[in-house]
């Protein structure tokens, strides 16, 4: 069959033949050029969509659970230590927690705010004595 005797259209990998028609040579489209342009367009739009999706997610390059943020690993490590030391989630506060957060040392508070107040008291006492 000659090209001028029938027309065809492509859909995916399948070629459909239709009834014979007369084709003007001016209207003949270079199929290789058309499909090459189509493939380039599809590829570039696919890349744009992937880039857009990746903008929303900062952890798109994360390969495993151990590559998460440091604070999560620190929190999980402390939780594991608490469970190992006999603390459970329902009773997460203990005397050791108080000691750690309030900085008890030899029965005295040594937190920054307490030290500042104590320093003011000592300064007031020393100025009172000097007068």
From Swiss-Prot:
Motif window: SOFL-B: 60-69
Expression sites (tissue/organ): Expressed, at low levels, in seedlings, roots, flowers and siliques.
InterPro entries: SOFL (IPR044670)
Source species, domain of life: Eukaryota
Short motif (Nuclear localization signal): ranges: 107-114
Keyword set, alphabetical order: Cytokinin biosynthesis, Cytokinin signaling pathway, Cytoplasm, Nucleus
Localization, UniProt: Cytoplasm; Nucleus
Biased composition (Basic residues): 114-131
Motif (SOFL-A): 11-16
Residue ranges with Polar residues bias: 8-18
GO CC annotation terms, alphabetical: cytoplasm; nucleus
Protein function: Involved in cytokinin-mediated development.
UniProt free text on domains: Domains SOFL-A and SOFL-B are required for function in cytokinin-mediated development.
Family to which the UniProt record says this protein belongs: Belongs to the SOFL plant protein family.
Protein name: Protein SOB FIVE-LIKE 4
């Amino acid at each position: 069959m000659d090209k001028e005797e029938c027309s065809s259209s492509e859909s995916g990998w399948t070629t459909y033949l239709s009834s014979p028609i007369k084709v003007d040579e001016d209207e003949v489209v270079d199929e290789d050029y058309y499909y090459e342009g189509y493939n380039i367009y599809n590829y570039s739009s696919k890349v744009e969509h992937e880039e857009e999706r990746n903008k929303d997610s900062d952890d798109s390059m994360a390969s495993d659970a151990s590559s998460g943020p440091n604070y999560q690993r620190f929190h999980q490590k402390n939780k594991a230590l608490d469970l190992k030391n006999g603390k459970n989630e329902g009773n997460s506060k203990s005397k050791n927690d108080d000691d750690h957060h309030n900085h008890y040392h030899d029965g005295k508070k040594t937190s920054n705010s307490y030290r500042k107040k104590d320093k003011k008291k000592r300064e007031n006492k020393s100025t009172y004595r000097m007068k």
